[in-house]
């Protein structure tokens, strides 16, 4: 974990929200990224680098929350309007929280990658957490969703290298042409 200075106003704290994607009914875990035509929803633990993939959104949230949210809606689209689910997210302890979800397609479509980290981000002008994407997720991200008070910075090279785009402070159904399908590392601030 590396801290890196960024120019970020410290006055805005993003809400924990969930964007839309469609889940496929089956909770069987798989490894890697799904074959064409089938979306997978993966959760990645930033500390260990361990990634598990599932066919349902509910299963990913169960794992990402450490079992504290076992009854999430079947799709992220349904979760957006679910006040009980939002309250459950906000009640998670400050350790091992969901920091962001990244989608293969615009409008929160296709496969998704939910990244879990050790805590919420501080609004102190620094990148609090950084992650180099595994090969199967490099150059695939088209929409993003920040959680746990994190703003997302997207970089075209590993190690937060190259020109960055962001911060993405709220749900972004299309990240724009600068980093669309070019992200290789992510800064969480």
Where on the chain are the PLM-derived regions?
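Compact beta-sheet-dominated domain cores in extracellular/mature segments
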Residues: 2-13, 25-189
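Hydrophobic h-region of N-terminal signal peptides that target proteins for export
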Residues: 16-23
């Amino acid at each position: 974990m590396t801290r890196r200075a960024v120019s970020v106003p410290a006055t805005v704290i993003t809400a924990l929200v969930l964007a839309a994607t469609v889940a496929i009914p089956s909770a069987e875990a798989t490894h890697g990224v799904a074959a064409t035509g089938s979306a997978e929803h993966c959760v990645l633990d930033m500390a260990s680098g361990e990634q598990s993939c599932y066919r349902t959104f509910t299963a990913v949230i169960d794992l990402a929350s450490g079992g504290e949210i076992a009854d999430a809606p079947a799709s992220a689209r349904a979760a957006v309007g679910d006040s009980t689910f939002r309250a459950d997210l906000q009640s998670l302890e400050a350790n091992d929280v969901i920091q962001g979800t990244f989608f293969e397609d615009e409008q929160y479509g296709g496969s998704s990658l939910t990244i879990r980290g050790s805590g919420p981000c501080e609004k102190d002008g620094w990148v609090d957490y950084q992650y180099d994407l595994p090969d199967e997720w490099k150059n695939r991200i088209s929409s993003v969703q920040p959680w746990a008070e994190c703003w997302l910075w997207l970089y075209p090279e590993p190690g937060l290298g190259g020109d960055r785009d962001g911060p993405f402070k709220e749900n972004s159904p299309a990240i724009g042409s600068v980093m669309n399908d070019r992200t290789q590392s992510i800064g969480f601030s």
